[in-house]
Regions:
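A structural motif
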Residues: 44-45, 130, 226
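Active-site-proximal loop/turn and secondary-structure-junction residues that shape catalytic pockets
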Residues: 51-55, 106-110, 139, 202-204, ...
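Conserved, mostly hydrophobic/aromatic
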Residues: 32, 39, 50, 133-135, ...
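Aromatic- and acidic-residue-enriched segments that line the glycan-binding/catalytic groove
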Residues: 1-12, 55-71, 121
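Glycoside hydrolase catalytic-domain groove-lining segments
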Residues: 69-106, 114-202, 248
Length: 252
């Protein structure tokens, strides 16, 4: 089920030495579903799916997808984005009976890019199948020069506000199109502005993020018309000062 090296058939690993499941493996899909159901059975209140994508770093010239290869390489109308869209639809169909929200983490630039970033993630392909979408709009993860900002870490408000404002526009446009073309689609009720719930940066990579920088991202989220967000720090040390007097400023 693993992604393989094209050169010798061994397990392919990224720069961190981590192996990857082939996103096109239906057996892997069933394995993920089984873990999700077991998580529900033991009492978790939400299922959040992360790393639901194709690899993005490592020796990409020596990579082979045993289950996705034919679809990814031989059919220009299929590709990585369609493989993942099919996976998202499968998750939804297999977990729709669970009385709990299902959410998905996407790269931050899925809110501003219309292509799949070569990892298979397209915002509109995920919207019909999850209760919440969490773009990881960490300012430090944007490339130098993004939207004209040479030092992205110096503009946490601007990066987050622009990214999430674009996502809000896209979800409204997507819902309008789908409502006119497939008015009876069951997923239309999922398509709402506050389906968007971004991950914001509260860590010190690659520079220390001050309370002001963290709060700027929170304010940027509210100003984009959203009312929920999450903070990320791998060390689980969060900036208390940034959270003082935080209220829901938008109830759309």
């Amino acid at each position: 089920k693993a992604v393989k090296r094209a050169s010798d058939g061994a397990v392919w690993r990224d720069r961190k030495g981590i192996g990857w499941l082939d996103a096109g493996s239906h057996e892997a899909w069933d394995y993920v579903v089984s873990i999700a159901r077991e998580s529900y059975n033991v009492g978790f209140e939400e299922l959040n799916f992360d790393y639901i994508r194709f690899p993005s770093d490592g020796n990409m010239r020596d990579i082979y997808y045993p289950f996705s290869e034919e679809k990814v390489l031989t059919d220009p109308d299929f590709g990585k984005a369609k493989v993942l869209k099919n996976f998202f639809a499968y998750l939804d169909s297999q977990l729709e009976d669970l009385d709990m929200p299902i959410s998905a983490d996407l790269f931050g630039m899925t809110t501003t890019n219309k292509d799949d970033l070569n990892i298979g993630q397209v915002l509109e392909n995920a919207l019909p199948y999850f209760d919440y979408i969490a773009p990881m709009v960490y300012p430090s993860h944007y490339p130098t020069g993004f939207n004209g900002y040479q030092n992205v870490n110096a503009y946490p408000y601007e990066i987050v506000n622009f990214s999430m404002s674009e996502a809000v526009k896209r979800i409204r446009e997507f819902k309008e199109i789908k409502a006119s073309t497939t008015p009876n689609a069951p997923y239309l009720s999922k398509l709402r502005t506050n389906q968007l719930r971004p991950w914001l940066q509260d860590n010190d990579y690659p520079v220390p993020y001050t309370p002001e920088m963290v709060r700027a991202q929170i304010d940027a989220t509210y100003d984009a018309g959203l009312n929920s967000w999450m903070l990320w720090d791998a060390a689980n040390t969060y900036t208390r000062a940034a959270l003082e007097n935080v209220t829901l400023e938008n109830q759309e």
